[in-house]
Amino acid sequence: VYGVTLSDELIKRGNNVIIVSDTLTKERKAKYIKLEFNKRGLSERINQIKTLLKIIKENDIHIVHAHSRASSWSSQIACKIAGIPLITTTHGRQPVHLSRKIFKAFGDLTIPVCENIQTHLINELGVSPKNTVVLRNPINTIEYPFAAQKKDESKKILSIIGRLSGPKGEVAYKLLEILSDMKNLEIRLIGGKDIPEKFQKFFKNKNIKFMGYVNDVPEKIKESDIIVGAGRVAVEGILSGKPVIAIGEAKYIGLITNNNLSDALASNFGDIEFSNSENFNWNLLKNDVESAFTLTKKELFSLRENVEKEFDLNIITDKIEKIYARLYVLKRKYDIPVIMYHRVVNDESEGGVPGTYITAKKFDEHMRYLK
């Protein structure tokens, strides 16, 4: 999702982007080339490197930006041979073992999506702090218009959004155990094609609805009064003006306000701890649900503004483009030509005796050429 969002915006700004990946089902503007990074045998790795070098040469690629461990490994070697920068985005905790410390494969610079990942990379994998910069996963915030919660309905809709398997499934199950007896709530579970057997005990509860996989999550967020989730789900909920209780795979953040937003951002709303540990305080859950209904429209809008500054697609893309340009110049060791204009005049008659001027017409021609 994030790779396509970023590539579409880069293309919109006049860049040429090619996506190389195992699979890609999302619509995109970029050209797509299939390459099975998930195959990690030696012969497959060599083939990946050869293919990447061919793509780099044939398409005059200046920068490679990898978004997974598997693609980073092959890209590290291909970029080294090609003499171009590699940038990686690190979306989660990485395995900590000797081979990873020796061959880090984080490129010339890695972009952890939250502060806890950055701390993990520096402390546990020995990545230099100067080779990391935190940037959130970009979101096109205009797709999530602010809509204050509904106040007039007797039964409120609380939506738990995320998978029902793995660690997120364990969190969802615990949520149902605690909240299933709250009479004023309709609890919706959104996500997951298959419902694990242990959830069947909640089928008879009329206040609990298993929605399964849905295509239009933003629409379901609009219908809700409270959102429970982590990562992108929490961000989308806040942008949409909904109270959000952030609970991820690693941590219970609770009801998000401006007071605990920095803690939420650092952990990607509960999904990532800087150490490999879990930190849940389920005793706060029911109180957080009640408190969510007391948040004012002003408080929710202020929270949205602060989150928008962190995740806005245009802001993030601006920063990434500057990173691309800086690293390319450093890697290729190019000098940057500088043109200095002393004076711009409307007509040559205004030039004066020294004649150190340029006409506005000629200046405009220069700018158009440079662009």
Where are the language model's segments positioned?
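Terminal accessory/targeting
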Residues: 325, 329-371
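Conserved catalytic-core segment of nucleotide-activated headgroup transferases in glycan assembly
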Residues: 152, 157-198
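A short, active-site helix/loop in glycosyltransferases that binds the activated sugar's phosphate group
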Residues: 107-132, 139
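Short His-centered aromatic/hydrophobic patch
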Residues: 66-72, 90
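N-terminal strand-loop element at the rim of the active site
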Residues: 2-44, 192-199
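A charged, aromatic-enriched C-terminal amphipathic alpha-helix characteristic of glycosyltransferases
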Residues: 146-149, 274-325
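Nucleotide-activated donor-binding/catalytic signature segment of Leloir-type glycosyltransferases, i.e.
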Residues: 191, 196-214
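Acidic anion/phosphate-binding donor-loop and adjacent secondary structure
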Residues: 122-123, 130, 136-154, 166-169
